C-alpha cells in the first residue's frame, strides 16, 4: 500500500531490504550491489552512511534477468561467485546463504539454488528434478502443467552463480516472446544443458519465504522477525 518502494517498507522496525542486506553481510559477502529503479533515493536513504554498498539503476523493468544484466559493467572485473537475491524477502537467514556457499564450493558448481518445500506452492516457480534427483529446470507457475503444479518444491529466489558463467548465459538469453522480459530462472537450466553442474539445497524453511503483499502478511512476518530477535 502507498507509493513507497516495497523493499523500503518497515517490518520489525527495519526496512525489508535492510534485513536482506544484513543477512548477506553476516554470510561474509565481500561486495554488495543493489539494483534500484523506482524511487531509488528512498532505497539509498536506508543505507545512508554505509560505504560497503554499490548501486546500479535498472531504468526499465524488463525482468529478473535484465535486473542482473544491468550489473554487468559494475562486475566486469569480478571473477568469483555471486548471490542473486530479492530485496523483499526479509526472513532470509545468513545460515541458508552459508549452506549454499559450502555446497557450491564443494561441488565446484556453476549455480546453486536453495529451495523450499511448502504446502501451497501456488505462484512459485517449481523445481524439476530428473530420475536421479538432480536439477533439471525451474518452471514458472503460469507455464507449469497440472502435474508440475503438484510439485511442492519451489524456488524462492535464492541463487548463487559463478558470475562469469552467469553473464555469459545472459548475453544470449532471449526475452520471453509474450512478456518481453528476460527471466533469470532460465539460466540454471541452460547451464545444466551445457553440462555445467547445478546444485540444489533444500534448505529454506517454509516460513522464510512468506510473501508480503498485504497488511496481514506484513503483520505475520513482523511477528516472526520479532520472535527471532
Predicted regions and their residues:
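His/Asp/Glu-rich metal-coordinating catalytic cores
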Residues: 82, 87, 95, 114, ...
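Structural beta-sheet core signal
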Residues: 33-34, 83-84, 111-114, 200
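Catalytic-core segments of class I nucleotidyltransferases/pyrophosphorylases
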Residues: 135-208, 215-227
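N-terminal nucleotide-binding beta1-loop-alpha1 segment
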Residues: 1-3, 32
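Conserved beta-strand segments of alpha/beta enzyme cores
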Residues: 7, 52-54, 134, 197-199
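A short, conserved acidic/glycine-rich loop-to-beta-strand motif
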Residues: 106-117, 125, 136
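Short aromatic/basic micro-patch
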Residues: 10, 91, 160, 211-212
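Conserved N-terminal catalytic core of the sugar/cofactor nucleotidyltransferase
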Residues: 10, 14-85, 91-102, 106
Amino acid at each position: 500500500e502507498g507509493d513507497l518502494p516495497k523493499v523500503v517498507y518497515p517490518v520489525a522496525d527495519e526496512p525489508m531490504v535492510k534485513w536482506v542486506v544484513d543477512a548477506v553481510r553476516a554470510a561474509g559477502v565481500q561486495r554488495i550491489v543493489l539494483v534500484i529503479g523506482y524511487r531509488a533515493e528512498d532505497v539509498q536513504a536506508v543505507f545512508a552512511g554505509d560505504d560497503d554498498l554499490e548501486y546500479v539503476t535498472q531504468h526499465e523493468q524488463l525482468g529478473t534477468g535484465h535486473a542482473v544484466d544491468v550489473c554487468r559493467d559494475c562486475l566486469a572485473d569480478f571473477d568469483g561467485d555471486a548471490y542473486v537475491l530479492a530485496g523483499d524477502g526479509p526472513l532470509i537467514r545468513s545460515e541458508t546463504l552459508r549452506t549454499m556457499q559450502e555446497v557450491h564450493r564443494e561441488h565446484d558448481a556453476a549455480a546453486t539454488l536453495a529451495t523450499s518445500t511448502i504446502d501451497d506452492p501456488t505462484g512459485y516457480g517449481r523445481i524439476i528434478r530428473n530420475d536421479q534427483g538432480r536439477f533439471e529446470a525451474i518452471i514458472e507457475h503460469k507455464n507449469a502443467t497440472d502435474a508440475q503444479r503438484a510439485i511442492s518444491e519451489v524456488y524462492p529466489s535464492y541463487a548463487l552463480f559463478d558470475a562469469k558463467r552467469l553473464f555469459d548465459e545472459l548475453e544470449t538469453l532471449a526475452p520471453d516472446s509474450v512478456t518481453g522480459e528476460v527471466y533469470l530462472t532460465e539460466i540454471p537450466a541452460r547451464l545444466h544443458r551445457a553440462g555445467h553442474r547445478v546444485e540444489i539445497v533444500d534448505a529454506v524453511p517454509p516460513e522464510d519465504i512468506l510473501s508480503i503483499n498485504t497488511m496481514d502478511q506484513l503483520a505475520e512476518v513482523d511477528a516472526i522477525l520479532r520472535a527471532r530477535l
